[in-house]
Amino acid sequence: MAALRVCARQGEASARLTRSIRTAKVPGLGACVQTFLGWIDGDPSHEAAVLRALGASGQQDAREELGLGSLRDSFADTFFPGLSTIQTRARYFFFVQWCCELAARRSAEDGILTALHRHEVELISALSHLGQGKGVIGIDSQDRLRRMPSDIYWSGLMRLGMRQAEGSPVHWARGVVAARETERQSPGREGEAAIESTFGFDSDRPRMPDNFPNLPALDFGLTTDEARTLRRRLAGACADRDGRLHQHNLMSVFMTHRRALPRGMSLWDHPMVPALQSETQQLLQLARAFTEVMYGAGILYRRTVARLSLPEGGQLDRYEGYAAGLQDWANALRPADVHLVLDHIDEAGRLGFATRHTISPETLAFVKAWAALCRAGPDLPASEAAAELVSRREVALKGRAGTSRIRLASARSRWRGGEAQRLDYRWGTAHQYLNDLASVR
């Protein structure tokens, strides 16, 4: 396997997230305590880190028991820049811009944000006729939704070049007001018209439909103009600022296949994979091998917790299910995947520099140690060394926080089990977007 040429930045950029608690007045509710995650204005990488944290909160494969998130996200950002696991349908990239356009016509910062919330609630209501399972964000919560579409798509809009205004929605609203005031104080200039047309977003965005979002038949069907714009933006997106990772943007090649993909098709089976550049195919092969090899570590972790739970009233059938699943995985594991991870995981680690993810030496050491043990093949489930390695890793990550299920019975008592999931690098979102686009010629 040829060496992968990956742009490596000097130093690792850690995501500086802030968690705050404040009291705010909510119309109709009075004073409420709100807990929120924020990011540093003007730094898109911090925005992306917040949304990754939000996306991980409800996903089985993103619990971070074994600390593989930085490697996973490095692959995902490289293959599918601008996408996230909490996005649902492609047309939201335009819905959010249009809601912001409507809201930005207000004259004050707080008025803009209040109007944005109102328009997004109207959007939820307008789409609710589509029913469950169609990707409608907030269909159950409606106006009680805590994570609006603008929060979910904000970072992606920047990555795709569809948002020019940097920073959070608050920073954007502040910028709209400031720009409008500047133009008003400049006699003889016609800049306000430009502000009114862009509002910090793509000046070439498709025109907002009349009466949006209050349309009786609003749905996720893209118009020809919307599909053309989105294809161009998705194809041009890149995970690093230097553009060296652009060759690994899978959407640029996958979108040339203008047919709907069947449900359940894996990333590895996309019909355009053979058309990828050689280096991209090699990187994709490494990502697949990493998924298959580390999947077993997730099963072993669950088997270990289930075994420790047995004297505490845990379910025997749960333990036996994990044990059987681990053996099935070990029997099917391909030695070629093990060797690929052992030989090339450092190259994947260098993606972290380019995509601004912190991949610690401890993470790479754990992956290498696990892969080395995987050479035992079908005998691995009986390996005490493998169980000890996985247990030590979880304790190292969670022990100080008091959430280690290996160490604490109290943490095990709150455990609901669940199946280990293979990493898919946001393929679920990409699969849906490709089908959204395939229906438009």
Summary of predicted features, one role per range:
Residues 18, 22, 26-441:
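Non-catalytic recognition/regulatory regions in large multidomain proteins
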